[in-house]
Amino acid sequence: MSASTAAPARDRLRIAIQKNGRLAEPARSLLAACGLSWRQSRDKLFCYGESLPVDLLLVRDDDIPGLIADGVCDLGIVGQNELDEQASARRRAGLPAAYHAVRGVGFGQCRLMLAVPEEWDWQGVAQLAGKRIATSYPAILADWLERQGIDASVVELSGSVEIAPRLGTADLICDLVSSGATLAANQLKPVELVMESEAVLAGAVREPADARAALLAMLLRRMDGVLKLRDSKLLMFRAEQGNVDALRRLLPDADPLVQLPDDGNGALRLQTMCHGAVTWQRLEELERAGAQGLMVLTVERSLA
């Protein structure tokens, strides 16, 4: 099916995620936190939604943008780098991308960087002129080189990019970097950022207009509730009225304080949602400012 052909009416939503790799487990955990559960097929590539009519496809990450563009899947969790690479390649071929990033999902952060042999005296991007750059992201790199006004050769490799300079097939590389350990092991050093990336929920530009529309809206609302509270804690305590302003100043990253019904002990009962780290040091600071009976609770989900 071409990207311009309307997808057939369906009453079940389909989501594609990476079968194996660094995004697989976080993606599945996020969807499970949204209330989804599945029955796995024998080939372990298709998971039938049991709690809701939302099915899961387990595929290679570089297949996900195409599955969305062709209407096979409605959504996918994939790296922004993979999404941009295929969108750029489609534009260069005169095709519409037909998909976009709907939400960042808070994991899979990495950087696409240029890396050169350690012995290079890096002076800046002007050194790239006439050089051969190995990468698995040729379209992103070509776009970046054009923006920099640099004429260099792009050597496309599907894997083991970091070994290309030692093999003599390239002078330097453009590859994803997380910790930098792989670069160091291959006597390379990162020198220039090409793009920041993270995992995103991707969807078709044209949203479904059939029964899937309500499922999509519900899923996005649930996901927002999970993501908003992922690093948040519910903080509950008692305090005298005269200490409330000082306590509020110690909670700049928290929602407004909410007063709960009086428990008969004279002090106010208060609670708030903290969106930053609630450390022992922070609790002790609040205690010194007059907070009593401090409790920190984990919140899994919310409907705002």
Curated annotation (Swiss-Prot):
Protein's cellular compartments: Cytoplasm
Reaction equation(s) it catalyzes: 1-(5-phospho-beta-D-ribosyl)-ATP + diphosphate = 5-phospho-alpha-D-ribose 1-diphosphate + ATP
Pfam families hit by this protein: HisG (PF01634)
Activity control note: Feedback inhibited by histidine.
Biological or metabolic pathway of the protein: Amino-acid biosynthesis; L-histidine biosynthesis; L-histidine from 5-phospho-alpha-D-ribose 1-diphosphate: step 1/9
GO BP of this protein: L-histidine biosynthetic process
Keyword Metal-binding tagged: yes
Assigned keywords, A-Z: Amino-acid biosynthesis, ATP-binding, Cytoplasm, Glycosyltransferase, Histidine biosynthesis, Magnesium, Metal-binding, Nucleotide-binding, Transferase
Names of required cofactors: Mg(2+)
Record's GO cellular component terms: cytoplasm
EC number: 2.4.2.17
Sequence similarity: Belongs to the ATP phosphoribosyltransferase family. Long subfamily.
Function: Catalyzes the condensation of ATP and 5-phosphoribose 1-diphosphate to form N'-(5'-phosphoribosyl)-ATP (PR-ATP). Has a crucial role in the pathway because the rate of histidine biosynthesis seems to be controlled primarily by regulation of HisG enzymatic activity.
HAMAP family, sorted: HisG_Long
Protein name: ATP phosphoribosyltransferase
Biological source species: Xanthomonas campestris pv. campestris (strain 8004)
